[in-house]
């Protein structure tokens, strides 16, 4: 939430706008997980993960560039953050649509065990990300957004 507070100050966001940006970080996740779950076997895991990679990199570029794109216009700043968060959420849902069948296929004799381990890792990552963001304290919010690049680079290298 500290990044959101920084965004609110820099872009003059209202409480409603903050809520809308938080919300757009969620509902596109649901859309992409459903849509990609329906087509992932047809298009392949690699193409789906490439889409997710582009979305995650796009999120970082759009959001980090928001001050340059928006200038002094708070309305533009809101929309840049909104669009960036939308794109990032599409990537998140796509990863989820891919990782479940991949794990179930790789560990077909112990699916439940490994899917549970996988999903236990998500809150661990959220906690780790939160601790890192807090540890970075007053460091510019753009560096905190840049933390997303660590796992994105990781899975990007795995795809190569």
Residue ranges and their predicted role:
Residues 2-12, 102:
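Membrane-interface helix caps of multi-pass secondary transporters
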Residues 78, 82-120:
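Cytoplasmic helix-loop-helix junction between adjacent transmembrane helices
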Residues 26-34, 127:
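Residue-level signature of mid-helix packing/kink "hotspots" within the transmembrane helices
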Residues 13-22, 77, 81, 115:
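Juxtamembrane helix-start elements in MFS-like secondary transporters
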Residues 109-110, 114-160:
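Helix-loop-helix hairpin linking two adjacent transmembrane segments in secondary transporters
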Residues 31-79:
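Conserved MFS/SLC helix-loop-helix module at the cytosolic interface between two early adjacent transmembrane helices
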Residues 53, 57-60, 66, 84-85, ...:
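A generic transmembrane-helix signature of 12-TM secondary carrier transporters
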